[in-house]
Amino acid sequence: MRVKTLGAVVLVFFGVIKLSDGALFAGDAMPAWQVTWEKTVAAAKKEGKLNFYVGRYGSEPLLNEFRKEFPAIKLVTVNGAGNTLGTRIITEIRSGTVVADLFSGGANTNYDILYQGKALDSIKTTLILPEVLDESKWYEGKHRYTDPEQRHIFVYIANPSSSGFYYNTNLVNPKEFKSYWDLVAPKWKGKYVSQEPTSTGLGGGLQFMYYHPELGPEFIKRLFGDLQPTLGRDRRQITDWLAQGRYALCVGCRETTRAKSQGLPVDELDNVDWKEGLELTTGGGSMSLIKGGPNPNAAKVFVNWFLSRRGQIALQKYNDLYGEDAPNSRRMDIPKDMLVATNRMIPGKRYFDVSDPKYADMTPMFNLVKEIMKAREQIKE
């Protein structure tokens, strides 16, 4: 009896050892997910390529980690502003030539341009690895999709403590601000510069302003109407204007971290203790699968790698394409100590998550902004 037991142990031992090489015994078959994964990787290697249209989180150091793991898949990136890339994808689809396999950018571009343009397949069906499928590893114990069907637009970032309002440190005392309403005090009339508010680049900030129960449409009217900000399409240029002291405050400036490191007098207002709480934003961190993309298996491999612990740790290691600090992943089972303090979620703090699907419709807020802009033009006339 002792010999039989020992033999069983030996069989089990060798069964485990041979799992990666193929089953020796009937009970040693690979789990279904692993069979699917290995077939997908093999098919991706045959495709040999992945076309990735990506915004700010397409830095080479980050993507090189994927290239090291899957050298047989040539990762080709097209970088640019989210709305520009989204429009390009739609144009390519309508011309009959689908080039992009995956898109990563702002949730608003994903929803307003690609989802509404019926350009997306279900990214949910590409998830294979158990560690990616396990929703308990993610913020609030669930995957976040911003589309109504909960399957097309996967949000992988939850960035807190970003007010989106920047200031010239020589002209503004940040201690003046205890609430968002302090930003629209009459004293700031004519002292703002802002990104053009009708573009999707300000979408996350506009969602927060519009849908927050303590702010709403009245706040937007005061900001873009009463205060009469100067508008610009080039976000680097408006950052330069802020640094030069032409304006005291800015909405939607970009590359301020880099400018600050160069000794320029710019910084972002810290809203960590403001009355209305903190915005939780995707910060350009949502991903979608393009319908009819030429390399569907390579796309599946990348999605699973990127959403795995390895991929999301890599995401948190590197600054984005604009030099801004690495973002906070919605994965909660990975270290957060490499993040700057302002990008870490604070236990007990109040967060307003704009990636909730009920806030996805941008139409009412953009209509409001267009009305404000029209009224401004009429005043000039």
Predicted regions and their residues:
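Non-transmembrane alpha-helical segments in soluble domains
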Residues: I90, Y111, Y115, W181-V184, ...
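Conserved C-terminal helix/tail region of periplasmic/extracytoplasmic solute-binding proteins
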Residues: G27, W33, M345-E381
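Bilobed periplasmic-binding protein-like "clamshell/Venus-flytrap" ligand-binding domains
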Residues: K49-F52, F154, V193, S308-N319
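Periplasmic-binding protein-like
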Residues: I220-G225, P229-G232, R236, P265-G293, ...
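Short, polar/charged alpha-helical segment
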Residues: Q34-K45, K49-N51, G55-K74, K260
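Short, low-complexity disordered leader/linker segments with a strong preference
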Residues: M1-E47, I379-E381
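Extracytoplasmic ligand-binding site segments that recognize negatively charged/polar headgroups
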Residues: Y53-N64, V76-I90, V98-R246, S261
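Mature extracytoplasmic/periplasmic domains
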Residues: G285-V354
